[in-house]
Amino acid sequence: ISTNKKLITLFCFLSLGLYSQNNTESNSYREDQFYFASSYFIQTESIKDFKQNGFSGNFQFGFVRDFPLNKDSTRALGFGLGYERNYFTSNIQPIEQDEQIDYRIVISRFLESKNKISFSSISFPIEYRWRKSSINEYKFWRIYSGFKIKKNFPLYSNPSYGSELVIEEIQDWTSSIYLNAGYNTWNISLEYDLNPIIKNKNTVDGDNLNVSFFRLGLIFYFL
């Protein structure tokens, strides 16, 4: 509960000064923004016999505070706070044996698409922002590139058979790089994981379980 209170307090702090483009005496202004995004996951590392099935992706939302770098505010740094919900469906099946979690690759046309794993993250984006905006222009082209630090919470697995498993072997902290670009509200989002999500684990066959993703999706900004 105390952690939630701290996150809410931090979110409110970042939201101070939300009214963007409020300096009428100069060309300087802030583009403080809420965002919402949805992405499709593509597994980036080669795992023997691995198959990604169905729709695997995430949704995320958050807030970015804008700090202009020039007098026209066309370049800026952004610091944010967000929440992500991630889920992927594949033929990776976690199984509980002797009070520990093992992983196997299911080779079965019927069962391979039935294994779903989900997890949540609190993200801290830091980005460089370029835009063709002005103090009176609300529709413009933008390119935002940056780096995310993420605090991850336990994995939840719904295997093809058996009960739901809670997996504590998730990397507590991971990072990614990203690029968001587009016009007005609609923007393309590209993101690449720099770390695997599961801590140094092998499958029961001895193959390294290096689960990390490339994300392709859309991100929407709201003032």
Report residues per predicted region:
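Bacterial Sec-dependent N-terminal signal peptides
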Residues: 1-26, 218, 222-223
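Short loop/turn motifs that connect adjacent beta-strands in outer-membrane beta-barrel proteins
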Residues: 22-32, 68-75, 133-141
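Predominantly the C-terminal beta-signal and adjacent terminal strand-loop region
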Residues: 25, 43, 168-223
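Residues that define the transmembrane beta-barrel architecture of outer-membrane proteins
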Residues: 30-32, 53-59, 118-124, 171-177, ...
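Surface-exposed strand-loop-strand hairpins of Gram-negative outer-membrane beta-barrel proteins
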Residues: 41-59, 169, 198-200
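Extracellular/periplasm-exposed beta-strand and loop segments of Gram-negative cell-envelope proteins
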Residues: 47-54, 89-119, 152-178
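Residues on the lipid-exposed face of transmembrane beta-strands in outer-membrane beta-barrel proteins
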Residues: 61-67, 81-83, 124-132, 145-151, ...
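Outer-membrane beta-barrel transmembrane strands
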Residues: 114-135, 141
